Design a protein with these regions (language model features):
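Short glycine-aromatic motifs
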Residues: 18-20, 175-176
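Flexible hinge/switch segments at interdomain interfaces of large molecular machines
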Residues: 29-33, 120
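Detector for C-terminal structural segments
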Residues: 1, 6-11, 48-58, 77-202
Length: 202
């Protein structure tokens, strides 16, 4: 279940943690006078990235947190990712159809080189559920396990999920067994229903 967008509740929780607007400028400070601020780095690859950057900035500032946006080109963005030279970033993950194996992104073993647990999140409960789900052959039972894993991820927030992009796919009529899933299509399930026409004789 997504965490609701509630700037006032965010301010209340931050106040409990010692962050308050002490000088009336709309930005939270701690008892040392340090402003609550961070830099948001993103790849300036188009309109969606720019709109998302504005959304992040506006949303946080409603809770009294100052955000400086830092657009960079794709090659520089990859360098910064590798160096981990950023305060906050946006990343995009694509899902396989009909379901994705969460081990590569969310298991603690995937923190190691070669894995994609880029945020280095470790959770014994998540590991247990991932291993259980991968051993569960019955699809309905496996979906129950994945829902439990989703609840752990939603609670611990290794990522804050912002959007799901719509998708549009075209498939020729002479392909059969085309199944649509919430995450897309799986071309390996397709089969051709008619022979490919031979080229016309000269």
């Amino acid at each position: 279940k997504p965490i609701p967008f509630d700037p006032e509740q965010a301010k209340a929780l931050l106040a409990e943690a010692g962050w308050k607007d002490l000088d009336g400028d709309g930005i939270l400070e701690n008892d040392k006078g340090d402003k609550f601020k961070f830099e948001y780095t993103y790849a300036s690859s188009g309109e969606i990235a720019e709109r998302l950057a504005r959304f992040v900035k506006d949303s946080y500032e409603k809770a009294g947190i100052m955000v400086t946006t830092r657009p960079v080109d794709w090659s520089r963005y990859q360098e910064l990712l590798k160096l981990r030279d950023f305060d906050a970033i946006t990343m995009g993950w694509g899902a396989n159809a009909p379901e994705s194996d969460p081990r590569q992104i969310f298991h603690s073993e995937s923190v190691k080189e070669g894995g994609d647990n880029f945020v280095q999140w470790k959770s014994a409960e998540a590991d247990r559920l991932i291993e259980k789900g991968r051993r569960t052959m019955d699809e309905a039972e496996r979906m129950v396990v994945w829902r439990e894993l989703e609840a752990v991820i939603a609670d611990e927030q290794p990522y804050t999920f912002v959007r799901v992009a719509p998708w549009l796919r075209f498939v020729k009529r002479d392909f059969g067994n085309v199944q649509t899933y919430r995450t897309g299509l799986e071309p390996q399930e397709f089969f051709k229903t008619s022979a490919t026409p031979s080229p016309a004789a000269n």
